[in-house]
Amino acid sequence: MANQNQTILAIYNSLCDQQDALSAAIQTTTDPQLAVTISTEIDEIAHRIVLTQNLLFKQDSPQLTASVNDIKTASQSLTTAIAQIQNTIAFVNSVTSYLTYVDQAIDLAKTLAV
């Protein structure tokens, strides 16, 4: 039986944690526009969750492993932005930054899978 790629698993877990945090945030907002914004970002993260699920058993590499540090840093910034979610621009920028690092790691993992 093959083992799961621990780097991809770490990215997957980070995405799930952020999706959970956004799901909690949307349940407490009273601003309809903010709810739409949060929902859009939840969709973006959910898409990456599906992509990482499809890569869980793919090959690892030093470059992929190194990418997790950038993702962790961006994830911490996103967690802070979620706590201050009323600042919509900072929140969206933080999600964008986080997903940029995630996308780079996913793209690298896909090239290793070929």
Regions found by a protein language model. Give the residues of each.
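Short, cationic, amphipathic peptide segments
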Residues: A74-V114
